[in-house]
């Protein structure tokens, strides 16, 4: 039996998450764990990086993991590693400074091959007994300014689980991937994709709920695809993802090709880049279930093998916050519902 969290989970947008985390790291006593796709010393994240280094220097167990995508995006080839770049130089400096202070820095994945294969897309942070996860915020300037959020949970058991997950991911060999798993916690079911190609606890759970739901609220960076995309589109009051012109070349190509293949269209009309990922399912009896986290609900990510994390919850307090986020930061300026066709 799990104890309830010390406080109700709270949804924090990127800038608020960064401020909260930086303050927590500055007063950390025992441990800090951070996993994200990208971690970089940028203008907005510089204070956090300094706090991580200072915490390690005063004896806190600080461990940071990020995907090599941090510095290879746009600079890697299919056969060779990343070419020299400002981000590569910055990553090397971060590695050196954190290790020099007594912390650990682990770069995940390979620099060569397909850019979307085998990525670590998981986002989680732990400071002592507080956890931030189940959202999509990366630790660089674009990450904290996107339309996105993280959930803050004061729960020692959850913090222990996420700390262990961070360490397990960091300990894996480059080609090693753990199986998908589901952990029961007071906040709900924690769905973990270990990155094995074709295996996703998150996609499977979302598909199962979508098939049972009467209606679905959708928000994601990308156009939903595969059987989940079809089930969501049938039940959603429109789909909410970026238009291709809002994205960088690789992401724009993925969005455009997904739209062409599925016929789905987006109602999102705001200019800021949408990076949040959530589904809220309303059952025929009125019960609501949400899945929120790092997964974009795209079948290709499952096929390629991507590490992800999400929360499945029935907590009305959490779901209300997700729906309010959607109303205030996603729905504003929307076009009329239209999910299929030209």
Model regions: which residues?
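Charged, low-complexity intrinsically disordered terminal segments
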Residues: 1-342
């Amino acid at each position: 039996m799990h104890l309830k969290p010390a406080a109700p989970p709270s949804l924090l947008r990127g800038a608020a998450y960064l401020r909260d985390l930086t303050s927590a790291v500055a007063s950390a006593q025992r441990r800090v764990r951070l996993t994200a796709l990208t971690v970089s010393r940028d203008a907005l994240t510089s204070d956090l990086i300094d706090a991580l280094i200072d915490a390690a220097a005063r004896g806190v167990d600080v461990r940071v993991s990020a995907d090599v995508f941090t510095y290879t995006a746009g600079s890697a080839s299919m056969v060779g590693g990343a070419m020299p770049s400002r981000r590569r130089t910055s990553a090397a400096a971060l590695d050196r400074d954190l290790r020099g202070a007594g912390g650990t820095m682990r770069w995940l994945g390979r620099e060569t091959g397909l850019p979307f294969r085998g990525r670590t897309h998981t986002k989680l942070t732990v400071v002592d007994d507080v956890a931030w996860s189940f959202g999509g915020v990366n630790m660089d300037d674009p990450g904290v300014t996107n339309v996105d959020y993280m959930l803050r949970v004061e729960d020692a058991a959850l913090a222990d689980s996420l700390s262990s997950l961070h360490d397990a991911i960091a300990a894996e060999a480059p080609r090693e991937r753990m199986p998908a798993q589901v952990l029961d916690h007071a906040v709900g079911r924690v769905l973990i994709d270990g990155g094995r190609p074709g295996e996703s606890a998150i996609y499977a759970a979302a598909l199962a709920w979508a098939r049972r739901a009467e209606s679905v609220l959708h928000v994601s960076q990308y156009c939903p695809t595969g059987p989940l995309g079809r089930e969501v589109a049938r039940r959603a009051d429109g789909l909410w993802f970026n238009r291709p012109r809002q994205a960088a070349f690789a992401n724009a190509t993925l969005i455009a090709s997904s739209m062409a293949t599925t016929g789905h269209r987006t109602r999102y009309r705001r200019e800021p880049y949408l990076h949040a990922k959530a589904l809220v399912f309303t059952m025929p009896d009125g019960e609501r279930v949400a899945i929120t986290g790092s997964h974009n609900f795209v079948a290709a990510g499952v096929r390629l093998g991507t590490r992800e994390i999400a929360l499945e919850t029935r907590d009305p307090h959490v779901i209300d916050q997700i729906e309010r986020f959607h109303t205030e930061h996603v729905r504003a300026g929307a076009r009329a519902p239209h999910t299929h066709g030209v």
